[in-house]
């Protein structure tokens, strides 16, 4: 056998012999999108397994209904943790393993801080550490990184095949794409993402009607317009998110959004440099979808946020590690190093803020010269 094989879970059947323990290690990536049944034959082929995933992102799509699933569990006396429709491989592993066997990857390297900070607080309990290299962000001329909301007072229509779309948002998105790539000749990657299939299809159709825009987007901007599922694992320099919801939004659309916060998390965190939200901000602020209402509040606060830390807090006077914000994110090694440096006469400032980053230990000389110890 080759020392390393890379296959999808469904293609393994025709590519890998069905024999026990033929691999020393099986690595399952995007495990929140893997159903349990499809992975069992792969587990049979391996001695050990590493399961990697994020249960705050997209789950697998079940081919059976919840009612069918429950009936099968009851018929064969199988515990709910093995539910095909409700639980992924990640969920199962997370439930049966001890906390000591779990490793959390907390450093975030993709997005500008304002973009990821909402998801960090809303979905990840503030545990992520932002480590994005801002020097690699691709920005349009004279534009800053971050979140921009284009307020559109539209009207929602319901197609015969279900879902929802908003022509007012579609027209505004075409205008914004023209501004970015035709007027400003932006060369970075661009994506347009929406929760609703009909909205994505109509945006794509609208782009088809503007040949110059279509040619630029698909040849120079690695462009993608689709629903959230097509963006899992992907990223773009600029993401335009079309919320769709506004006046006359069908009740079913609101229920769908309420139950799919993980889709919203994936959608907005695909953006590296700029997240542009196109939608009715007033409607979204009271739409009865909690995470959407929180996001509106967050974006409104961004414009009013002032960062002016008190420099007096940056000179600890004792060898005891100080009480800093988000103390749960500080490792025991950081605390130990702080103490040993203090004993050696080297005074450091823990969790020193620089823009949206927090330096583990900073050495500050005369309020000017700074050294970061990570």
Summary of predicted features, one role per range:
Residues 125-205:
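Conserved helicase/translocase motor-coupling segment
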Residues 1-22:
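Conserved helicase NTPase catalytic core signature
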Residues 342-372:
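Active-site metal-binding core of divalent-cation-utilizing nuclease and nuclease-like domains
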Residues 65-103, 120, 212, 250-352:
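Helicase C-terminal subdomain and adjacent C-terminal extension
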Residues 21-27, 226, 234-246, 266, ...:
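A short beta-strand element within the Helicase C-terminal
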Residues 80, 86-156, 162:
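Interdomain helical connector at the RecA1-RecA2 junction of SF1/SF2 helicase-like NTPases
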Residues 34-86:
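Signature of the SF2 helicase/ATPase Hel1-core->accessory helical subdomain module
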Residues 21-35, 50:
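SF2 helicase catalytic motif II
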């Amino acid at each position: 056998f080759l020392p390393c094989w890379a296959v999808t879970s469904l293609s393994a059947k025709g590519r890998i012999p069905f024999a026990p323990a033929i691999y020393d290690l099986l690595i399952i990536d995007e495990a929140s999108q893997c159903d349990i049944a499809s992975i069992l034959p792969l587990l049979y082929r391996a001695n050990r397994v590493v399961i990697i995933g994020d249960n705050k992102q997209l789950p697998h799509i079940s081919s059976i209904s919840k009612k069918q699933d429950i009936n099968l569990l009851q018929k064969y006396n199988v515990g709910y943790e093995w539910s095909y429709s409700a639980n992924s491989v990640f969920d199962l592993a997370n439930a049966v393993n001890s906390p000591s066997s779990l490793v959390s990857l907390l450093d975030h390297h993709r997005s500008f801080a304002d973009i990821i900070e909402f998801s960090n607080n809303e979905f990840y309990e503030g545990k992520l550490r932002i480590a994005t290299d801002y020097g690699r962000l691709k920005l349009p001329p004279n534009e800053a990184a971050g979140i921009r909301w284009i307020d559109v007072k539209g009207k929602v229509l319901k197609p015969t095949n279900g879902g929802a779309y908003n022509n007012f948002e579609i027209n505004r998105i075409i205008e914004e794409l023209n501004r970015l790539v035709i007027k400003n000749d932006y060369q970075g990657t661009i994506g347009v993402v929406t929760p609703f299939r009909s909205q994505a299809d109509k945006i794509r159709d609208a782009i088809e009607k503007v040949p110059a825009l279509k040619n630029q987007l698909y040849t120079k901007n690695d462009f993608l317009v689709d629903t959230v599922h097509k963006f899992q694992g992907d990223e773009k320099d600029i993401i335009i998110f079309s919320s769709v919801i506004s006046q006359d939004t069908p009740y079913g659309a609101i229920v769908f959004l309420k139950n799919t916060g993980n889709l919203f998390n994936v959608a907005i965190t695909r953006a590296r440099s700029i997240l542009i939200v196109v939608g009715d901000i007033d409607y979204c602020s009271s739409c009865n979808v909690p995470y959407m209402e929180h996001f509106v509040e967050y974006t409104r606060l961004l414009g009013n946020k002032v960062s002016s830390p008190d420099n007096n807090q940056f000179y600890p006077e004792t060898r005891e590690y100080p009480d800093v914000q988000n103390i749960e994110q500080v490792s025991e090694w950081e605390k130990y190093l702080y103490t040993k440096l203090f004993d050696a006469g080297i005074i450091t400032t823990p969790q020193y803020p620089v823009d949206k980053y927090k330096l583990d230990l900073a050495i500050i000389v005369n309020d000017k010269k700074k050294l970061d110890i990570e």
